Amino acid sequence: LDFIGGYPNTDEEPFSAWLKRTKQTDRAIRHFWEPVIVGALNDTFERCSTRYAGQVFHESFLKSAEGGRLGIPSQPLSEFYAAVAQQAEKQGTRLHVRTSIDRIAAMPDGTWTATASDGSVHRAGSLILALPFEQTARLLGTLAENAVQRQRILPAMEHFIHAPITTIHLWFDREITELDHAALLDTRIQWMFNKSRIRRFEGGGAVEAGQYLELVISASFAEIHATREEILAAAVEELACFFPTVRGAKILRSGVLKEARATFSVVPGLDQYRPAPDAAGGNLYLAGDWTRTGWPSTMEGAVRSGRLAAEAVARGAGNQERLLSPDLAATGLMKLLTR
């Protein structure tokens, strides 16, 4: 009931304390809160604030039916975003792929330069650092020590930490399941995605023989220190508990991807250190899910950060246009209950 009307405005309380305070049962924690909160926030209950755990629950399950819809790309992300890149280029945007920036600098005339690793220098009137927090800190560290942008933002960076994700890719010689995806309970694996079935929606030719499954382990702190073989063996054993066909199937190919810096952790008390997009000042803007979006470390938060940064740049040019899409409206009875 705590989250029916909304969620806390402050982020000081860890979600583990809320679970204890509201006397959640072990079964409720294992079979509901773990799949939902660990899967969404990619962290342990001790490292998640009640504010953002409550937001996930309220927005996904209570506020509206639309908020709980799950979108799964039916193609690799590199292809998924290719159309966006092509559209940007048609509008005059220049994209420099496989290019890293070594340093940035503020010019006397108020413009900015970004120097790439190949020595090329790019100049702009406004500069948006749309980067993870550690890369933002790296580039801010290339500014002069007395630079106001460095002094305003860099000290807050020490309060941010990462959480890892591990994905296991398995190619079997036969069909394992007809499900497109599934949440797995009482396992280290939170989600199974049937990539063979999901990609059939692309409509691009015949589906390959066998089946390709992707398994996701959120908050995979233990797996970061495990070997590839240990992770694979444990994952296959857990998968077989739900899909017995696995035991008689042959694994044709497999892969394990550990992302130690997958997301930032919404640890209790972090909100006070999350900068607004225009917090740096001087035509330097910040974007990234870790900035002050009002959302946790999710794709929704990342999209909001980009739009908020674009709004800030537009404001600097005297344009007050809103680019942030409105939040989903409450529906049904929730219209009366949502704060």
Label the predicted regions.
Residues 1-104, 112:
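Active-site/ligand-binding neighborhood in enzyme catalytic cores
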Residues 8, 70-73, 77, 120, ...:
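Aromatic-acidic/polar surface patches that form glycan- and anion
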Residues 21-23, 40, 139, 242, ...:
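Alpha-helical structural context
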Residues 23-33, 148-157, 245-252:
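Short, surface-exposed acidic
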Residues 87, 94, 135, 142, ...:
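Active-site catalytic microenvironments for nucleophilic, acid-base chemistry
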Residues 95-97, 129, 286:
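A structural signal for the hydrophobic beta-strands that form the central parallel beta-sheet
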Residues 99-246:
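Mid-domain catalytic core of redox enzymes
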Residues 180-339:
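Conserved flavin/dinucleotide-binding core of flavoenzymes
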